[in-house]
Curated annotation (Swiss-Prot):
PANTHER family (UniProt xref): ATP SYNTHASE SUBUNIT A (PTHR11410:SF0)
Pfam families: ATP-synt_A
Alphabetical keyword list: ATP synthesis, CF(0), Hydrogen ion transport, Ion transport, Membrane, Mitochondrion, Mitochondrion inner membrane, Transmembrane, Transmembrane helix, Transport
Name used for this protein in its record: ATP synthase F(0) complex subunit a
GO cellular component terms given for this protein: mitochondrial inner membrane; proton-transporting ATP synthase complex
Membrane topology: Multi-pass membrane protein
Single annotated GO MF: proton-transporting ATP synthase activity, rotational mechanism
Gene3D superfamilies: ATP synthase, F0 complex, subunit A
Oligomeric and partner information: Component of the ATP synthase complex composed at least of ATP5F1A/subunit alpha, ATP5F1B/subunit beta, ATP5MC1/subunit c (homooctomer), MT-ATP6/subunit a, MT-ATP8/subunit 8, ATP5ME/subunit e, ATP5MF/subunit f, ATP5MG/subunit g, ATP5MK/subunit k, ATP5MJ/subunit j, ATP5F1C/subunit gamma, ATP5F1D/subunit delta, ATP5F1E/subunit epsilon, ATP5PF/subunit F6, ATP5PB/subunit b, ATP5PD/subunit d, ATP5PO/subunit OSCP.
Spans traversing the lipid bilayer: 14-34, 69-89, 98-118, 139-159, 174-194, 196-216
BP terms from Gene Ontology: proton motive force-driven ATP synthesis; proton transmembrane transport
Length: 227
């Protein structure tokens, strides 16, 4: 049976049971469990430093009222980061290449930030739909444009994460396939292609980390507008 390049993005199944939930739970096994020791080991210390760094970066734009979101945003950042990095391992499934999953993360959190603004400061939240100093004839058009841009925010969040990871995985598979195909006939070109593959893999490691950070950072900026 001929396999398609997009088969790697299909959700794996065992006896008809989707295994995507298992892949979502696996990153939690990599996190060190807390203990009662006075001195933590190197892994726990590194994890604590990383979480503090993420929390500081995400909470800096927010006021004190937004600090209650620190736990969920930091947890989401760690979750996406681990899933993206684990998806770069050979023969693994990356759940964040599924638009349905990314939308399931983006839409509820975006809606929560929007409802927070409408509850706490409705006039300011609705005021974002009409920029200050807008000429009167342009008011209806600008309200429609701003409303549309507001409603497509969760779609943009989900599509951005899906597209970046999907494109990277496809490039890696295409170049690795070309490397194996050229090895028997043109070994020199195959070595050069393997070098490109190594550089692309390093780039994808950076993309996996950056996209997880951008996803959560944009959510924190949406929250900043509504608190």
């Amino acid at each position: 049976m001929n396999l398609s390049f997009f088969d790697q993005f299909a959700s794996p199944q065992l006896l008809g049971i989707p295994l995507i939930l298992l892949s979502l739970l696996f990153p939690t096994l990599l996190l060190p469990s807390p203990n009662n020791r006075w001195i933590n080991n190197r892994l726990s210390t590194l994890q604590l430093w990383f979480l503090q760094l993420i929390t500081k970066q995400l909470m800096m734009p927010l006021n004190k009222a937004g600090h209650k979101w620190a736990l969920i945003l930091t947890s989401l950042m760690t979750f996406l980061l681990l899933i993206n990095l684990l998806g770069l391992l050979p023969y693994t499934f990356t759940p964040t290449t599924q638009l349905s999953m990314n939308m399931a993360l983006a839409f509820p959190l975006w809606l929560a930030t929007l409802l927070t603004g409408l509850r706490n400061q409705p006039s300011i939240s609705l005021g974002h739909l009409l920029p200050e100093g807008t000429p009167t004839p342009l008011i209806p058009a600008l309200i429609l444009i701003e409303t549309t841009s507001l409603l497509i925010r969760p779609l943009a969040l989900g599509v951005r994460l899906t597209a970046n990871l999907t494109a990277g995985h496809l490039l890696i598979q295409l170049i690795s396939t070309a490397t194996l195909a050229l090895l028997p006939t043109m070994p020199t070109i195959s070595v050069l292609t393997a070098t490109v593959l190594l550089l692309l893999t390093i780039l994808e490691l950076a993309v996996a980390m950056i996209q997880a950070y951008v996803f959560v950072l944009l959510l924190s900026l949406y929250l900043q507008e509504n608190i």
